[in-house]
A protein has these predicted regions:
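Extended, histidine- and acidic-residue-enriched regions that form the cofactor-binding/catalytic faces
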Residues: 1-94, 100-214
């Protein structure tokens, strides 16, 4: 790519996490989702896709095996520095996060970007009520990416009433010993492809958003 072309290009940055997703999905589920959405967008728009940022703020999963979490402060600071380093090469960054726990960190990144004059946008998957973690949504998307990623025989339902408030107070382990918040039993690859098409369209809308005049 010629250097002079880079100044008006958009960079998609997949942001994930490394945390439990029940017994049936991999620890890298959120990173796979974010990377898949970015790659889907790259098939319909001329954008660049950065290597995935595979860790995030996942303190709510404390106590489950395999957790690697940076926390909100470190995640935000790392991504602020990423924006600063990218500004000479790309005129717009779109962070595509597969993990809802990154919301506060990315909100901080956007706030700093606005002050410093950078064009930074953020996208998160739309969640279905009662299906926030390792349920039908994420399981379907991973089935559409590669069925070998999903151990369907291990999928279990777990969505206690009022789980959102409880999770914020006590963490996921206190309300769901399996780590699942949702029902993966109805997951299908076709459903995953439908979700991906919708999510791709949402990110494309961000890519196509009119730019501020510098």
């Amino acid at each position: 790519m010629e250097q002079q072309q880079r100044g008006r290009r958009t960079l998609l940055v997949p942001v994930g996490s490394f945390e439990q997703h029940g017994s049936h999905l991999p620890l890298t589920t959120d990173t796979i989702v974010a990377t898949t959405v970015c790659n889907d967008v790259a098939t319909v728009r001329d954008v660049d896709v950065a290597p995935a940022f595979p860790y995030g703020a996942s303190g709510e999963h404390e106590g489950f095996w395999g957790l690697l979490s940076l926390g909100t402060d470190a995640t935000a600071q790392a991504l602020v520095e990423l924006v600063r380093s990218a500004r000479a090469s790309w005129s717009r960054l779109v962070f595509v996060s597969g993990h809802g726990g990154n919301f506060e960190a990315l909100h901080r990144v956007v706030t700093v970007a606005q002050v410093e004059g950078d064009d930074v946008l953020v996208w998160f998957p739309t969640d279905h009520e009662g299906d926030a973690h390792a349920g039908v949504t994420e399981t379907s998307v991973l089935l559409s990416v590669d069925p070998a990623l999903v151990r369907e025989e291990r999928a279990v339902f777990a969505a206690p009433e009022g789980w959102m408030a409880q999770a914020r107070r006590s963490g996921v382990r206190a309300i769901s010993p399996t780590g699942v918040l949702g029902d993966p039993s109805d997951a299908t690859a076709e459903r995953g492809r439908t979700l991906r098409a919708r999510w791709c369209g949402e990110v494309v809308a961000l890519v196509d958003r009119p730019r501020r005049e510098s």
